[in-house]
């Protein structure tokens, strides 16, 4: 059935088509099914998302139409809804076609939602050789990693710079200052407390960057030291707990920008950012926490006292052992963390034997890309 729009329509104008109806409400087209709104489609959204060859680059599948070429009060001149296909005619004679199922798919998440750890949580282990050689193993491991933010690879080589070999699964190393692959041992130059035998409180690295690395791999080459257990912490869970218990503290930690600095003789990085960041929907996307890199705040700034009340609460949660997951990294273990979510720490150790760790940085977007491409490859195998 085709509905012509020769006159201005109000929301009282209804077009019954099968079990669906079309309502026009201002600048939107509403599709109603079984007394509930199935889709609300702004006119400009419809025009902007036309998939025809004229509006899309056929070779690259990129959009070529730009919205400034039509009026902001654009309205359809014709609507046709046949089963699952919506066709729109525009005043300039252009026609756009849409599959309703494809539009509904846009509301689905591209990846499985993140999972809270729960009591007794321990990271999943995956074998180095299987992870690199077997796509199915890598897909399972990386999918779980995107959900929990942590995994451990065991059986890794003891050779220096073996982290370079993870690029085939994690994407390229994210280069930062202070070395491409960092050596963390007592024999190296000391510009960070990690290069001592002291305890290292929960933190994520490079809080001093405007956008810190979003994934970190910590490769234990050798661990002959006594004590020195590794610790991880789900900082998003801590932040959510504060949001529930003290929403005023949570708001302060989202709004008050804090200075962070990391430096040595040759380099310096400095950023002033809030500790907690949320997306437009209020979901936590980053917790930036580094006691050792945080710098003095101007005490005359508005809100400093409120910030310190909130920060004290946060520090108490971060150092509470009930929030910690503890384990020992042995030689050949690689701890991989989603660094904007999972903080890492270390207990003090006794250097009775050599303890040598190397770490490098990656980007979560690239890891997510690997999951997408591996899923496509898996689907192609089944289709074939």
Map each language-model feature to its residues.
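Active-site environment of non-heme Fe oxygenases that use a 2-His-1-carboxylate facial triad
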Residues: 9, 109-140, 144-150, 155-156, ...
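Motif-centric detector for short Cys/His coordination patterns
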Residues: 1-134
């Amino acid at each position: 059935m085709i509905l012509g729009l020769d006159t201005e329509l109000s929301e009282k104008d209804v077009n019954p088509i099968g079990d669906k109806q079309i309502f026009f409400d201002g600048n939107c087209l509403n599709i109603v099914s079984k007394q509930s709104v199935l889709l609300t489609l702004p006119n400009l959204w419809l025009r902007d998302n036309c998939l025809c060859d004229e509006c899309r680059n056929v070779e690259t599948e990129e959009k070529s139409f730009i919205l400034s070429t039509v009026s902001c009060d654009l309205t359809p001149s014709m609507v046709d809804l046949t089963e699952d296909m919506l066709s729109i005619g525009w005043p300039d004679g252009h026609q756009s076609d849409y599959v309703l199922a494809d539009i509904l798919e846009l509301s689905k998440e591209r990846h499985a939602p993140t999972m809270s750890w729960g009591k007794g949580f321990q990271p999943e282990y995956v074998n180095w050789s299987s992870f690199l050689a077997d796509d199915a193993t890598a897909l399972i491991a990386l999918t779980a990693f995107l959900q929990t933010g942590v995994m451990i690879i065991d059986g890794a080589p003891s050779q220096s710079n073996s982290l370079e070999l993870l690029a085939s699964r994690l994407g390229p190393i994210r280069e930062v200052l202070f070395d491409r692959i960092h050596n963390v041992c007592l024999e190296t130059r000391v510009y960070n407390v990690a290069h001592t035998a002291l305890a290292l409180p929960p933190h994520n690295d490079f809080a001093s960057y405007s956008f810190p690395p979003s994934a970190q791999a910590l490769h234990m080459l050798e661990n002959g030291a006594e004590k020195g257990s590794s610790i991880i912490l789900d900082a998003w869970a801590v932040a959510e707990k504060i949001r529930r218990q003290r929403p005023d503290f949570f708001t302060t930690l989202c709004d008050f920008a804090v200075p962070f600095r990391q430096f040595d003789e040759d380099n310096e990085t400095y950023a002033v950012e809030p500790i907690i960041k949320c997306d437009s929907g209020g979901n936590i996307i980053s917790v930036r926490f580094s006691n050792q890199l945080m710098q003095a705040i101007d005490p005359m700034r508005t809100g400093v006292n409120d910030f310190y009340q909130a920060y004290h609460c946060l520090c108490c949660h971060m150092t509470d052992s009930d929030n910690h997951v503890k384990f020992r990294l042995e030689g050949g273990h690689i701890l991989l963390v989603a660094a904007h979510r999972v903080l890492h720490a270390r207990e003090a150790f006794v250097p009775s034997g050599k303890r040598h760790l190397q770490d490098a940085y990656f980007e979560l977007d690239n890891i997510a890309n690997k999951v997408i491409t591996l899923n496509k490859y898996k689907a192609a195998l089944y289709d074939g």
